[in-house]
C-alpha cells in the first residue's frame, strides 16, 4: 500500500454549520460544491477533507451511527482502480484488520469497501472515477 491518506471524511450532525466553519471560518477551498449537495469536499495540500451527514456515512459503512464502532470519522485511502482497492483491502485484512463492508460498486459511481484497524478505527478503501484522489 502506498502510504498516503487521500481523504478524511467527518460524519457531521449539522452540515450547514460545519460547511460555514470550514469554508468561512477557516477559509478552506471548496471543490465542486453546489448548495444541496450531501458531500462537501475541500482540497487541501496533499489530501482532501470531506463533510458528509453522520447518519449517511454510518449507513454507507454499514455500521450503527450510535454506540461503539462508529466515531463519525472515516479515513479514506484511494486507489486508481477497482483491482487496487481489492488488493489493499486484502492486505489490510492480512495485517489484522476486520472487514466491515467488502468492496463493491457504490451509489456515488465508485467502488469502495470499509475495514476497521485493530483498535476499531474505520478506513475506507476506494476507487473514485470522478476525481483523482490517488
Regions found by a protein language model. Give the residues of each.
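Short phosphate-engaging motifs
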Residues: 14-18, 84
